[in-house]
Amino acid sequence: ELPPSLKLYQEIQHHYQALYPDLKFSTAKNHASVLSYWDKIGTPSNKHRWCCAVMKTAPIYRLFKIEGNKQAKVLTFDGVRAEESTRRSNYGRIGKGVKHDTVINARPILNWSTIEIFLYLWRHNLHINVAYRQGMTRVGCLICPFGNEWNEMIAQKKYEEPLSPFLTKVEQFAKKGGIKDIKNYVGEGGWKRRASGDLV
């Protein structure tokens, strides 16, 4: 995740625990780093999109098991919006068993525009991720095969240090794979188009 997203989570947790002291927050994390999975599986790509399942969904289900509810029925409110992508424009406001049988996805802001989102946030004085104020159009992972050039440029300028290990890993894979123009491969997102089981 982007550093300001993690910071925002902490701020929101602190804010709501001050208001509701009995409110419990649980954090689901994978037992290994995302880069260790890159070593095993290769970079995620627009064809091999393993990252969300491995780094987000699986840890949530593991957390349910740890907390004693192996077959928890889950209602997830997510913030996806139709204007974000062609795929998302085909989503319904309610998705039953879309990725997992026991999960219902509710998408209350699916048909909202970006302007409507920010007007709502400002009107209700809600926390806003700093990355939006820095110019990002979508806030998600620090590096993503579905990321756009604009967000990548901002991430490289604002989050050079946390981004560096990922770009170094992409360069290493490119070198191992015999890519001639590594700078171009990394800069133009060649790693995002990986379609085979190979690392590049």
Spans of model-derived segments:
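ATP-dependent adenylation/nucleotidyltransferase module used to activate substrates
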Residues: 1-123
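ATP/NTP-dependent adenylation/nucleotidyl-transfer catalytic domains that generate, transfer
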Residues: 116, 122-200
